């Protein structure tokens, strides 16, 4: 977590960001700043634009309008080197996207060698360091099929870290995991936060957001409805839309009653 001064240059700066798919306006004027070393959790209902925002930050989706800056560089500038931008941003998805025919170590060394042009020895050294970082040194020679979902996600995090990113983006990293496997992944993310990694996390893990995030952003309908400290946004939200979302998320029985049309 961060102690970054509010006067310093934001590590991530999103300015009047819009994204449309045909007639569907998914993002409708997003303004967001994330300081160096800051952890920001983005929450909201399905279809609110959370994942699209994340994908626009590293240009997996091209914004319709607006600007995105990472480390002071405008990544949405028409002349930007997109590959260079993506080398500065690590991203972890819901699905692990590991190569099944490669060992864990090879999954970490391949992108280093192809993208960063590291030699085999250096790539292997960095791979080993980052597997240790996520607590999976003993799985270096294993293949993805022999790992649990949680272990595969930790390998995916190690793979992203091996590229030396300035910021890490997480898109629902635990949503595809069985409940008993979530804890180890969140523990790794907590460790990264305490190490000072700048992190933007789309999540429904409210305990993680409460304990680790510097700020929580609630999105709905393609806009930021509420942005503040976890104790405020989660514990005492000021907007009815936020309160309604959290009541359904934290009390599934209430959500079922509403869906059934009960009073």
Name each model-derived stretch.
Residues 9-230:
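ABC family nucleotide-binding domain
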Residues 232-263:
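C-terminal boundary and immediately downstream tail of ABC-type ATPase nucleotide-binding domains
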């Amino acid at each position: 977590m961060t102690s970054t001064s509010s006067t310093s240059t934001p590590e991530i700066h999103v300015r009047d960001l819009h994204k449309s798919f045909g007639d569907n306006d998914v993002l409708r004027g997003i303004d967001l700043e994330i300081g160096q070393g800051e952890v920001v959790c983005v929450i909201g209902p399905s279809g609110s634009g959370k994942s699209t925002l994340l994908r626009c930050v590293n240009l997996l989706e091209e914004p319709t309008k607006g600007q995105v800056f990472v480390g002071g560089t405008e990544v949405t500038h028409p002349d930007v080197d997109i590959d260079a931008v993506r080398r500065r941003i690590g991203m972890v998805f819901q699905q692990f996207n590991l190569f099944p025919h490669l060992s864990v170590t090879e999954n970490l060394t391949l992108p280093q060698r192809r993208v960063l042009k590291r030699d085999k020895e250096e790539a292997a050294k960095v791979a080993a360091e980052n597997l240790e970082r996520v607590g999976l040194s003993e799985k270096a020679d294993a293949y993805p099929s022999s790992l649990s979902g949680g272990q595969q996600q930790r390998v995916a995090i190690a793979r992203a870290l091996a590229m030396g990113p300035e910021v890490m983006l997480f898109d629902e990293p635990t949503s595809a995991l069985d409940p008993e496997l979530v804890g180890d992944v969140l523990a790794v993310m907590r460790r990264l936060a305490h190490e000072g990694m700048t992190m933007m996390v789309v999540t429904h893990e409210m305990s993680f957001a409460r304990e680790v995030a510097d700020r929580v952003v609630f999105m709905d309908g393609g806009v930021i409805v509420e942005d503040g400290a976890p104790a405020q946004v989660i514990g005492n939200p000021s907007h009815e839309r936020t309160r309604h979302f959290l009541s359904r998320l934290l009390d599934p029985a209430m959500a079922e009653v509403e869906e059934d049309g009960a009073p």
